[in-house]
Amino acid sequence: MQTKELLKLVENVLDERKGQSISVLDVIGKTSITDYMVVVTATSERHAKSLADYVLIAVKENGLIPLGIEGQQGSDWVLLDLGDVILHVMTAQSREFYQLEKL
């Protein structure tokens, strides 16, 4: 799967599952670890886990294996490393506190 296809898949799953304020950050040339970071707001910790789980299922159904997952159990920030795309699922409070888009 090409990077743009993966990015679109992630965005579609997040939108279908009611992720809020989906932001795609193009970090090509700014970091060597990924091409895109996706930041999305979840309505609760349970919703954050659910969003990450649905993306994980969709990615696996397309033959990809995630490189890493952090913060799945009772966390206000779940990180899913898909290689060329890194997904940050955060509650509104965490997103406001960390302000990843401003880095």
Regions found by a protein language model. Name each.
Residues 39-41:
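Short hydrophobic/aromatic beta-strand micro-patches
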Residues 32-35, 81-84:
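A short, glycine/Asx- and small/polar-enriched loop/turn
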Residues 1-29, 43-50, 57, 70-71, ...:
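Long, contiguous binding/interaction regions
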Residues 61-69:
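Active-site phosphate-binding and catalytic loops of NTP-dependent enzymes
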